Amino acid sequence: MRNRPLTFLGADGSRLSARLAVPPDGRVEACALFAHCFTCSKDLKAAVNVSRALTQRRIAVFRFDFTGLGESEGDFAETNFSSNIDDLVAAADYMERELSAPAMLVGHSLGGAAVLRAADRIPSARAVATIGAPFDPEHVTNLFGDRLEEIEGEGETEVVLAGRRFTVTRQFVRDLAGHEMGEAIGRLGRPLLIFHSPVDRQVGIANAAKIYEAARHPKSFVSLDQADHLLLEERDSLFVGSVLGAWARRYVDAPVVEETPDELRAGDRVAARTGTERFRTEIV
């Protein structure tokens, strides 16, 4: 897998950092847009491993840091779930202009909820996949514990998530509550693949059941037995990427173009064609 660094303008004009993962030989049949988990980054090992597995299926993967996170510009305190959705749409627009429009959307954790909401604004996407996604974005507030009252009363507070400090604002929390996911999932209108671990301690398996129930067919569920929420074990993220790649080929594969007899003869080649009846081989 090769990673090509890129930058593009997010929804608020901030310059966002991205990576385009492509197969070693550069041959790409489709592109996927990947949304990372809450307060994570495009360089999370799980995201990289999923990308590596997809490139083996000739699916390029565009990963980026949301505004205010990772190597991207902007202030995290001024962002929210709605701005994440807008950043995804901005990324898809950039891909369509400069690379290739995303044929598949993939989201991890809150990024999974974001791709479910963004899908109706990204018409090129023919399939959607979520990994450990919450049914309701407001589920994220469980991470703030008893600081929620302080956020509501004071307007903002600093919380520690995975050893890092983030300023969480009242507008961020209120925005999480303003999204009706059931209707959005019901009108997705695309094949959906849901990955979730039955032992996920951050986003319980009941969330996957609700997403599955709200979605229409074709929809599929894959249980990530014994996996943690962040897919810290390499085998888990590689498994997700491998299964996702096989599933995606059904929906985003490039059309097969058969060579004509004249094209087969070109370049000093000899080709044989077998018929469908009797035992006959034709040298063309």
Language model features: what each stretch is:
Residues 78-98:
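Alpha/beta-hydrolase active-site loop
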Residues 227-239:
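Catalytic histidine-centered segment of alpha/beta-hydrolase-like enzymes
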Residues 247-284:
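Extended beta-strand/beta-hairpin segments
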